[in-house]
Amino acid sequence: MKVFEGKFNGKGTKIAIVAARFNEFITSKLIGGAEDILKRHEVQDDDINLFWVPGAFEIPLIAKKLAQSKKYDAVITLGAVIKGSTPHFDYVCAEVSKGVAHVSLESEVPVIFGVLTTNSIEEAIERAGTKAGNKGADAAMTAIEMINLIKGI
């Protein structure tokens, strides 16, 4: 059996990060984790571009524009949607995740879902660099792996 998998080498790649400003305290930690991983895997600082959007709901549109531009090898989406006492959380989470997946499938550019969807601020903090690792870093690793896997197909 011949096995294909992406390598973890970001040299020569260009990455866009789309980040939601809402819950910026959490999102900034995710960005830091993503940036650290990208640089550790040889993505040059000038090849990492950050695009701020007001909230998570706006992420898919900007991700689509960036993917369609063909300027980027991958788009990483980062944000934090924290459950409140209304069903708004469910609507936002569903639409953002569907929107990001749709952009990736339509554009054939890896668009990585790094948006936290948590029940509490404590859970978000845990996933932004404490107990549960940093999901921004995980998203960056996924981006690098997917770029290289696609190149090998």
From Swiss-Prot:
It catalyses: (2S)-2-hydroxy-3-oxobutyl phosphate + 5-amino-6-(D-ribitylamino)uracil = 6,7-dimethyl-8-(1-D-ribityl)lumazine + phosphate + 2 H2O + H(+). The keyword Transferase applies. (2S)-2-hydroxy-3-oxobutyl phosphate binds at S85, T86, R127. 5-amino-6-(D-ribitylamino)uracil binds at F22, A56, F57, E58, A80, V81, I82, F113. Its EC number is 2.5.1.78. GO terms for biological process: riboflavin biosynthetic process. GO terms for molecular function: 6,7-dimethyl-8-ribityllumazine synthase activity. InterPro entries: LS (IPR034964), LS/RS (IPR002180), LS/RS_sf (IPR036467). Keywords: Riboflavin biosynthesis, Transferase. It comes from the Bacteria. HAMAP family: Lumazine_synth. Catalyzes the formation of 6,7-dimethyl-8-ribityllumazine by condensation of 5-amino-6-(D-ribitylamino)uracil with 3,4-dihydroxy-2-butanone 4-phosphate. This is the penultimate step in the biosynthesis of riboflavin. This is 6,7-dimethyl-8-ribityllumazine synthase.
